[in-house]
Amino acid sequence: MAFNLRNRNFLKLLDFTPREIQYMIDLAIDLKKAKYGGYERKHLTGKNIALIFEKTSTRTRCAFEVAAFDQGAQVSYLGPSGSQIGHKESMKDTARVLGRMYDGIEYRGYGQEIVEELGAYAGVPVWNGLTNEFHPTQILADFMTMLEHGKGKRLDQIKFAYLGDARNNMGNSLMVGAAKMGMDIRLVAPKAFWPEEDLVAKCRLIAEETGACITLTEDVKEGVLGTDFLYTDVWVSMGEAKEAWDQRVKLMTPYQINMDVINATKNPDVKFMHCLPAFHNDETTMGKEVADKYGMKGLEVTEDVFESEHSIVFDEAENRMHTIKAVMVATLGD
């Protein structure tokens, strides 16, 4: 069933019903099939899209650009040093300027209140590419990937665990998404790194309606048992000081996804997910610093898990583009 999401902002999953979320995922699946099949139709021809990036990006930027190009749109990239936003011009004013020039605006940056203000004043669809609190386009890609690898299970039949820093934008967003879609989510983390209590309470209220199960636990074995998917993210988020590493590594090491954790699921077909980039070896500058300082080749996930048959991280990364395309088509397409 089609939904009319035209001219809607896409700022956080809390703003959407389960059926609207499922519609966007289904649309992404259809668009992916069309791209691979060579019969994709352009729904954004003649549209101009602004991409505001106050934080750097690989996957999100590329996904928005390729998705827009595939659909016939033109994009302008405004990078961290490429505009006056927040320096000489407020977001409220920027929104009203860009809204006169562009048909849609993506924002990736800091506080959720910034993208909310952009959405309130732009007068055109605004899409959240990541804020400190939420990362909704990633969740659409994650759930699409779970459907592809879930052996025919619906989202409300899937069990998954998120290990690590559960108070960050990924922990928040996965919990909201799971609550909306009636899923069984286990947030496995030190108690100090659980999501804010008010957000947990909101999600539990949603879960009462959807049948979702939300578990917060510090016990890794209890949290991962019987899951279909294991998910993690970096232990120190974008913008945090390097000084945070020492304490974070000490607290988070028990929550590393390694082969012992894979085996603890008791599911030989369990799949591993990560929004990327991941610290899984010492082949990057940061990875080498970590290896030299802590004697660990890999932090939140080990190399043997990341490169194993359990890992579906690159399918997940590709699906960023298909789901972002679906969001733009649903809210801006003809």
From Swiss-Prot:
> Has UniProt tagged this entry with the keyword Transferase?
yes
Q: One Gene Ontology cellular component annotation?
A: cytoplasm
Q: What is its EC number?
A: 2.1.3.3
What reaction gets catalysed by this protein? Answer: carbamoyl phosphate + L-ornithine = L-citrulline + phosphate + H(+)
- Any idea which GO molecular function terms this record carries? amino acid binding; ornithine carbamoyltransferase activity
The organism's place on the tree of life at top rank:
Bacteria
Q: Does the keyword Lipid metabolism apply?
A: no
Pathways per UniProt: Amino-acid biosynthesis; L-arginine biosynthesis; L-arginine from L-ornithine and carbamoyl phosphate: step 1/3
Predominant cellular place of this UniProt entry's protein:
cytoplasm
Which SUPFAM superfamilies does the entry link to?
A: Aspartate/ornithine carbamoyltransferase (SSF53671)
| Localization terms from the record | Cytoplasm
Residues bound to carbamoyl phosphate: 57-60, 84, 108, 135-138, 275-276, 320
Residues that hold L-ornithine according to the record: 169, 233, 237-238
Q: Which example biological process does GO assign this protein?
A: arginine biosynthetic process via ornithine
Q: Which InterPro entries match?
A: Asp/Orn_carbamoyltranf_P-bd, Asp/Orn_carbamoylTrfase, Asp/Orn_carbamoylTrfase_sf, Asp_carbamoyltransf_Asp/Orn-bd, Orn/put_carbamltrans, OTCase_ArgI
Q: Which UniProt keywords apply?
A: Amino-acid biosynthesis, Arginine biosynthesis, Cytoplasm, Transferase
Pfam families in UniProt? OTCace, OTCace_N
Q: Which PANTHER family match?
A: ORNITHINE CARBAMOYLTRANSFERASE, ORNITHINE CARBAMOYLTRANSFERASE, MITOCHONDRIAL
**Protein family:** Belongs to the aspartate/ornithine carbamoyltransferase superfamily. OTCase family.
The record's listing under HAMAP family reads: OTCase
Q: What does this protein do?
A: Reversibly catalyzes the transfer of the carbamoyl group from carbamoyl phosphate (CP) to the N(epsilon) atom of ornithine (ORN) to produce L-citrulline.
What is the protein named?
A: Ornithine carbamoyltransferase
Q: Which gene encodes it?
A: argF
